[in-house]
Amino acid sequence: LASGLGLALLLGGCGGQVQQGQDQNSGSTPAGVDKPLLLVSYAVTKSAYDRILPRFQAAWKAQTGKELAIRTSYGGSASQTRAIIDGLDADVAALALAGDVLKLEKAGLVDPGWEKELPNGSIITNSVVAFLTRPGNPKGVKQWADLARPGVSVITANPKTSGGARWNFLGLWGSVARTGGTEAQAKDFVSAVYRKVDNLPKDAREATDTFLKRGQGDVLLNYENEAIQATKAGELQTPFVVPEVNVRIEGPVVIVDRNVERHGNRPAAEALAKYLSSEAAQRIFAEEGFRPVHPQVWDQVRSRFAPVKTLFDAASFGGWKSIDQTFFAKGAVWDQLFAEKR
């Protein structure tokens, strides 16, 4: 790993939150130091990037002879997307869903065709939805339908601020509509589940804290990687449940073209984005609970993850433009359900 006093001083702020609108690349850089990067990502990726970024920095120095500072910002994917549009100077954005990248594209920050710039359609991680339950799973929650049973209290993040919450929503909807049910039946089921949600944390990590640290709810819907991390940390006493019918959660990475053009750091931004698909980075993602997209790595670690019999994805809903228009736009299905809940 990159280390040493000089690099430690240079990267003293690396990993800290960057305030919206702050230009971390202003001013000149000394000899032997490259222009810094800002990576903006969603909340639950921090543990992976804490391990991946130092390895990339070491590889960059070995290749170029220059130190590279990388600052980071984490939060709910929808909130991070809005922050970038409003002025957060991201050079690389690793978000929870392609729909958020499309918003950056619509805002003129990302060039069209970003899906073709990197391997695997610019997707760097996969995951699925997991259910975390209380010790012994006293409510017997094993499948999606169990969430609508009387007496089952559900915790999930807010789809307006959290990408993971949108995936949870699609998982709920698809568990009916992608297994032979009608759209009307799916809406009734999703409505029944959300009536059991007492509060909506702003992101997936806060949802985990609400369930595990504050003791709220009978079951938490969250990323599988969050469940794996909670198990490793000894915070989850009962094995989590991965429903056999599930949604493929795809996390993209993108270079924020307008920002890197202004900052003059495109080579480093492109190198970082590509590195995230490398075997080395994908192994770390797998160790942190994500399902890797690198074929060889996935073949080697597949047995660590619960099998899923029926796996649908965003494309089965018509893609993220259609998903946002149908479910999450102003006045769309989510707003209707939320109004009913209130």
Say what each PLM segment does.
Residues 17-161, 303, 342:
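N-terminal segment of the mature folded domain
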Residues 179-245, 252:
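Ligand-binding pocket segment of bilobal, Venus flytrap-like solute-binding proteins
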Residues 9-13:
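C-terminal motif of bacterial Sec signal peptides marking the signal peptidase cleavage site
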Residues 40-42, 133-134, 153-179, 193-197, ...:
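Short beta-strand->loop
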Residues 136-142, 161, 174-182, 259-269:
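Short helix-loop capping/hinge motifs at secondary-structure junctions, enriched
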Residues 1-7:
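Sec-dependent N-terminal signal peptides
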Residues 54-62, 85-89, 98, 105-109, ...:
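Sec-exported extracytoplasmic/periplasmic mature domains
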Residues 14-17, 260-342:
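Extracellular/periplasmic juxtamembrane helices and adjacent flexible linkers that interface
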